[in-house]
Amino acid sequence: YAPHYYSINVDEINNYSMLVASCNNAAVENITIDLPKARDILDSLESSGDDEEEIRCGLDEVHDLFDINKSGDVETITRYGKSHEEKDIYFTRYADKLLGGADCWGLISAPFGRKANIRKYCNSVLKPFVEDYRSNDVREQHKAKYLEIRKKFLSQYKLVENLRKELGQICALAGSVPVELQEDAPEDLSCEISDVERKRQMLERQLFAEQKELIELEESRPKGLFARRKDTSARDIFIQEKKATISKLNGEITSLNNRISGLQNLQEYQRCISKYSHGQMKMTPVDAVFMERYVSEDDRLSTKAQITNPWFTAQYNREREKLFLYACKLHKEFVISSKCMRHNIINLMIAWNVFDDCGERMKLADREEAMPYMLQSIFLLTPVISTTFASAQTFLGDVKKSGVLGTLIVDEAGQAQPQMAVGAMFRCRKAIIVGDPKQIEPVVTAETDMIKQLLTAEILAGYKDKKISVQAFADYINPYGTYLGKDEEKEWVGCPLVVHRRCIDPMYTISNVLSYDGTMKQQTAAPKEDRARTFILDKSCWI
């Protein structure tokens, strides 16, 4: 094997690796099997007849970027002295081989977990990669491609950042306008601003006159200690009254200044919003109208608010999608042109005993020292990898350091006992916990149940509940959420996703009433008529 292992110079790159873990093997496998499929992405980018021409053009442009048949990126593959060309987006041929010819666009994710899955990944991806990019000449060619795509990526990144900042400024501008002013805005803002400015000027003239009189009163006071004693108290009373009047005028002027500022911000905000009101620039602002819909008891209006994406535009999304593709291509050229990446991959396969004819075996100390960096290389090649918690013990067993990987995504977290996620969380830098506490509870063995009964200390009382899960812990520390249920039975749920896109009636309505206190918003596509007819049988099959 290669005599050295290599780490990535810029450690921040490792922030973007993603490990998806769950108790449910099928759930996490489905995620990583679906992401590389071209059909799902292409379908989501299909324009409809109702779309404006500008929106259709934007969708069609991004659609073609993810269509392998329209890709202008061609790879020359040389094996056994013979060369052939293949169209590519992001290691497309490896993804196709890994997923059994599933018509993929790129190797964005892979299912691990079971040992058979890891071996299949090695045989379908790592071995061909090592063979295809063995030549120094090939790597040099890809270095030139790397520099070329880097320019495109940086240019696109600058464009996306400028759009983000512009949208952020509008968001901040909306926040600077008082809510009551948004709700009761004058019809003619320019006229209203002029009126308020005239009032301010009038008060400023009055203030100037009062200040002048005060100065004259102060200067007309008798000089000397004995002379001042003889002065009547009426003058002092008059001076105090002048000061009170001046203070009141200052307050009124400040109030008018604030109103002018608010009206000017509202005027600028409305000007910006009118710019973002059609085509690819159309945007949903979080304003008084949006909030009225959001909290409305009318299910149709509240659902409309829930399914919107505030402060985003179609143009911004399309440019972000192009940026994502350029980022994938940048990754690809970097990975191919790096000799260190190739060495790390070879060493990883030896550590995993992939080569049956390899007489060398990596020592435990070497494995534990090198494994964090070899896995980081794999995640650079395939950013999203899935595993079950049961298999994570084997997959990550040689990683003894914390924070080696980027983000841990726990799926079906309501089914996972808290201790199951500890090892994976230790090895990742942050975690996203996704689950539903109203669905299947964690499966607790008799031994675990017995241990929980021994937790007699008051501080440990919360850990005794059999239903406690990774999801419950995440919800407990999440300050954003809502309560489901009523009175003693209410349960805190963090960041609830209330829009439902899977079930149809009657299952949806029954579940929504029984488990979710009527908070869910249905957006499931209606089934085709021929399928709907077979959903409810004419008669019971139970009797």
Q: What label would you give each PLM region?
A:
Residues A390-T407, G414-I543:
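Conserved helicase motor core of SF1/SF2 NTP-dependent helicases
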